[in-house]
């Protein structure tokens, strides 16, 4: 695939989906997706993202009460819904993930460092959520990311008793082109950027 084709597939031609075709996404594709997105960079390789791929009726029914009313239909229709979370105790894995600095875990441990650890987890987990979307599109999947849901309800349903918190959710599958909205405007370089 040529560079422009790939950029179109991931960015310029890709659209946030509002409806889905009933084409299943096999578990092997979800593994391939994770095995690609995990290579995106994070601070000290902290890799705090934690994912739940909701694909069963039981999982959907756990998810349903947390959704904003306007998001229920499209979310329930998605072949897979990824709950993109982040582990606030990500640093427990750092001895394995960042082995050349044995002291790195201590940067985040302790009551006085909770805010720093939480900020690091949220920031880098969000980065990884972006990598998830780019990787999914590169693999031929469409995405429908959204934040119209109750985080506390999702955390209770899927992450109770853990140090994982939800960030956003993202439908994955093959979008229904009939349900895609017209592309909204984007800010120009001059509106969004400065050269210093």
From Swiss-Prot:
Alphabetical list of InterPro entries matching this protein: Nitroreductase (IPR029479), Nitroreductase-like (IPR000415), Nitroreductase_HadB/RutE (IPR050461), RutE-like (IPR023936)
Family of this protein: Belongs to the nitroreductase family. HadB/RutE subfamily.
E.C. number: 1.-.-.-
Keywords: Flavoprotein, FMN, NAD, NADP, Oxidoreductase
Disulfide bonds: none
Broadest EC class assigned to this enzyme: oxidoreductase
Name of the featured protein: Putative NADH dehydrogenase/NAD(P)H nitroreductase Reut_A1586
Cofactor section: FMN
One of the record's GO molecular function terms: oxidoreductase activity
